[in-house]
């Protein structure tokens, strides 16, 4: 379970979820018709080794990401989510935005794999050990960012707005923000703090995009945590419900919309249909997760 002020690297606690998601992105890239291709996802997996690499080589057919009930749909989910945020950044760049803020950057490689306009600066915020891992792995394969990239080692439960300004962020210029796979790992109070920080720093012409999940009922959440613990006792390595906060400060579209942003929420299930991927039924392991998830983008005039 989480504790106040807890920290992590790429193989522990919340950091391990970034590796799990990177593995899903790497599996998506292996498809003949991928929704998005992140060539660095596989590099991160192989740098860690173990099951993250084995599943890519077909050596772990029982891996959670290979199951029909969950894995197939989760890989589709990550392909769709990656595509959504990639296209969001392209729209922001086309609109003239040259400051990009990636909150809880994890193993996000967009600074290296997307085509950025000249004079773009990308600010990546995350735990120091996570940023160290990414930098060392990418340097090891001689990868170079396609825009100016600035690392900001900070906990998003601390004064990250000041750390961002100290790194050269200009709140008077438009910016593009993402919170991808982040909000569920923050309690409602920290989500509110995060949204407030974005709203305070985002000038006119700014964009924001977030992924959010509607909370489960307390009974369903407690049952999911108990089932996960039981699976761990049987030797399975599952750690998700024990890491998340089953809380939400407010739906993002409502929160930003009430503060002058034009927000567009897209239920994940609708987006999966839009990009030609199946939507899992409610009786599958992945179904309820997909049904609760929404992708939101907003623009400040």
Swiss-Prot record:
Exhibits S-adenosyl-L-methionine-dependent methyltransferase activity. Its EC number is 2.1.1.-. SUPFAM superfamilies: S-adenosyl-L-methionine-dependent methyltransferases. PANTHER family: S-ADENOSYL-L-METHIONINE-DEPENDENT METHYLTRANSFERASE YKTD-RELATED, S-ADENOSYL-L-METHIONINE-DEPENDENT METHYLTRANSFERASES SUPERFAMILY PROTEIN. Belongs to the UPF0677 family. S-adenosyl-L-methionine binds at residues 126, 155-156. The keyword S-adenosyl-L-methionine applies. It holds the Pfam family LCM. It comes from Mycobacterium avium (strain 104). Keywords: Methyltransferase, S-adenosyl-L-methionine, Transferase. GO terms for molecular function: methyltransferase activity. InterPro entries: Ppm1/Ppm2/Tcmp, SAM-dependent_MTases_sf, SAM_mthyl_Trfase_ML2640-like. One of its GO terms (biological process) is methylation. This is Putative S-adenosyl-L-methionine-dependent methyltransferase MAV_4873.
């Amino acid at each position: 379970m989480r504790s106040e002020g807890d920290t992590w690297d790429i193989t522990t606690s919340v950091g391990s979820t970034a590796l799990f998601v990177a593995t899903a992105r790497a599996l998506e890239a292996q498809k003949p018709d991928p929704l998005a291709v992140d060539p660095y996802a596989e590099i991160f997996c192989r740098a860690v080794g173990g099951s993250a690499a084995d599943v890519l080589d077909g050596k772990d057919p029982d891996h959670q990401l290979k199951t029909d009930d969950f894995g197939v749909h989760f890989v589709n989910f990550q392909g769709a989510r990656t595509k959504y945020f990639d296209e969001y950044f392209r729209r922001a760049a086309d609109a003239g935005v040259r400051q990009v803020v990636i909150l809880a950057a994890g193993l996000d490689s967009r600074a290296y794999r997307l085509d950025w306009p000249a004079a773009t600066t990308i600010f990546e915020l995350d735990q120091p050990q996570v940023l160290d891992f990414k930098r060392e792995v990418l340097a090891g394969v001689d990868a170079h960012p396609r825009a100016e990239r600035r690392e900001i080692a900070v906990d998003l439960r601390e004064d990250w707005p000041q750390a961002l300004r100290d790194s050269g962020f200009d709140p008077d210029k438009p910016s593009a923000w993402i919170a991808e796979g982040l909000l569920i790992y923050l309690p409602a109070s920290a989500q509110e703090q995060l949204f407030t920080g974005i709203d305070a720093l985002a000038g006119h012409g700014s964009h924001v995009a977030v992924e959010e999940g509607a909370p489960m009922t307390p009974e369903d959440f407690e049952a999911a945590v108990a089932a996960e613990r039981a699976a761990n006792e049987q030797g399975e390595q599952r750690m998700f419900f024990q890491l998340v906060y089953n809380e939400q400060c407010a739906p993002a579209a409502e929160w930003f919309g009430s503060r002058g942003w034009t927000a567009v929420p897209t239920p994940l299930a609708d987006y999966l249909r839009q990009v030609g991927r199946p939507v899992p039924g409610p009786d599958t392991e992945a179904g309820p997760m997909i049904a609760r998830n929404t992708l939101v983008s907003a623009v400040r005039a």
